[in-house]
Amino acid sequence: GHFGGRRELMSLETARQAVEFLIAASKHRRHCEIDFFGGEPLLNWEVVKETVAYAREREKETGKEFRFTITTNGIGLTREIMDFINDNMYNVVLSIDGRKEVNDRMRRTVSGKGSTYDLIVPKYQEMRRLRGDKSYYVRGTFTAYNLDFAADVAHLNDLGFDQISVEPVVTQAGEPYALSEEHLSKILAEYEQLAQLYLERRERGRGFNFFHFNVELKKGPCLYKRLSGCGAGFEYLAVSPAGDLYPCHQFVGQDEFKVGTVWDGLINSQLSASFKESHVLSKQVCRGCWAKYYCSGGCHANNLFHAGSFTEPYQLTCAMEKKRLECAFFIQARAASD
C-alpha cells in the first residue's frame, strides 16, 4: 500500500529478512509477534502466507514462538483466506468505521464508486461466525465527521459483533477530519453515552466488549509496561515494504524517524533510546497525573503531530483518556454493585 509513502508491495525476501531481524533483535525472548498491516495485506496475500510458513520453520530451528495478527479492510476476504487466518492467526482486526454513511465517507473504493460497507459487512459477519471463540475485533476510527460515535458502536453491535474498538483519529492537525479542542465537550459526552449503552446492552443480554473500557484494576501489565505503553521504537517496530524500520506505522516514510533496516539492524540507536526514555516519569506533565499508569503517556505520533514533540503529551488525547478511564471505572463499579 501507500501508507506513509509510495504504493508498493513487500517482497518475500524482505519479509523473510524481517523475520530474521526479529529473531536476532528479540535475543533471549521466546515469544514474538508479527502484525500484517498496511496499506492492505490481502493485496500481498501470497507473501503473507509464505512469511507465516517461513516463521513456522524458524520456530523449530530457534525455539521461538511466533504469534500472528492481521489487520484488513475486508474487501479481498474470501472463504479460503478466512480459513487460513482462522488456522494461523492469533487475532484478526476487521476495519470498519460503523454506520454505512460514516464508513463510506472515509473508506472508499479505488474507483470511488460503490459502497465498501456493502462489500465488507457480509464478509465480516461470516468471519465472525467462522472465528468461533478465537480472538477478533472490529476496529473503527471516529473523526470530526462522526462525533456521535456511540451510534457507530451500537450499529456494529447490531450487526452481530461483540468485540469492538472505535479509536480517535490520529492525523495532522490541518486535516478537515482532524479532532480539535472545539470537539472535546462533545467527545467526552459521547463516551458517557457509550458507557450507558454498554450497560444497557449488557443488561439486555446483548453485551459487547469495548476496547477502551477493558481496564484491569487488580492485575494488568507490570510497572515497566505501564511506564511506556506500546513500546514503539524499542519493543515494537514497523517495517516498510522496502525493509526500512520505523518506531511505528504512523512514522513510516518520515526519514528523520527511520531507525534502521531489516538487513542492517538498528542504526539510529539514539532515536530508539529516546523513545524508550520517553515514559510517564520523564514527562513533567504526566508525573502528577492520576491516569499515568493507564495511558502510559499517550500515543507518540499524536503527541508529535499536535504538541510538536513525541515527549510532550497532547492535551486533547489526555482528556479523552481520562474520560474513558472514568467510564471504565463506572462500569466496573456498577458490575460490583450488581
What are these regions (language model features)?
Residues 101-121, 125, 129-236, 240, ...:
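Radical SAM enzyme [4Fe-4S]-AdoMet core and its adjacent flexible, acidic
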